[in-house]
Amino acid sequence: MTYKGQLTAAMNLLAADPAVRFIGYGVKIGGRAAGTLNHVSDSQLIETPVAENLMVGLATGLSLAGLKPVVFIERMDFILNALDAIVNHLGAAQAISCNQFKPAAILRVVIGNKSKPLYTGPTHTQDFTQALRQIIDFPIVELKKESVVSEYRYALIRLSAGTSTMLVERKDEW
């Protein structure tokens, strides 16, 4: 199975849980996350503007309401816009609230393609994975072709237990 095929299978696996909601730009309108959400019910898709801080903030709120959010960040370059929500809200709410609140989300983050067409330039292909590991205290997983579905399965288990996970995809692998 191709890398993209595995991503699609992983999204279908997540969607089998009725509490899962996919959040992001292009998840419902304009491509359904590059086709990887084609078989997911519209009722599980929440389309947002290109506003990464909003996406993660929305995910935090949905998690507190008992849902299981999966945020699609189409280019890692723009995760920087979401760091306030990731570090100071999603990542710190449990400590700030003395364990009263424990929001969690899956962050699906894509590094843009550098070696395959369409090269989208230096502002759409940066990899901040190592830097993010220095400031985010939940697991960050770089997806390999042979483990895409299993890594998303583990992320869903962690999510159900109240732990966030960031999964990093490489568009060049598609």
Description of each model-found segment:
Residues 1-174:
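Thiamine diphosphate
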